[in-house]
Amino acid sequence: IVIRPGVIIGGGDIFMKRLLPIFKTSFFIPLFGDGSTKFQPVFIDDVSLAVEKIITDNIEGQGIYELAGSRAISYKDFYNYISKCLNKTRVLVPTPLNLIKPIISIAEKTPFSPLTSEQLLLFEKDNIIQNIDKSFKDLEISPQDTLQITKNIIEN
């Protein structure tokens, strides 16, 4: 059995831990690419519940469990939602990926890099479940609402 989660949020995750300080302190927010790339963030508690269920229910066999959140959302829409939750006006600055790649490849060699080259790849194409082998549904789990979880993270 293979468990393949989407971008994990919650529980002090790296994604939100790096993103929120930028939104809290910067007026201009870099938007890698044009922001139309979609992703499907998943709450850590939902992933933990799925792993627990696979183990405790003694699920055997083969298969890939693609665990993704309740909705696919573009980075642009997600960033705008974060701004709204923070009650802050932010200007999203589209940044061509081919321009940012060399900068990130140098920056990631320092302790101050906001992200890695590998993480930058997530902005190149949609990161949503498509060819589902197995998912939360097969485990009788309904993933929590991604935007509500994001709002809770921001408020706490």
Q: Language model features by range: what are they?
A:
Residues I1-G12:
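Conserved beta-loop-beta element that borders a ligand/cofactor-binding pocket
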Residues V2, F32, D133-F136:
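Short glycine/proline- and acidic residue-enriched helix-loop micro-motifs
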Residues V2, K38-P41, A72, I129, ...:
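Short aromatic/basic micro-patch
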Residues D13-M16, D34-T56, G63:
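Substrate-positioning beta->alpha
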Residues R18-Q40, I44, K84, T89-N127:
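Alpha-helical membrane-targeting segments
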Residues K53-L115, N131-N156:
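Mid/C-terminal beta-alpha module of Rossmann-like enzyme folds, strongest
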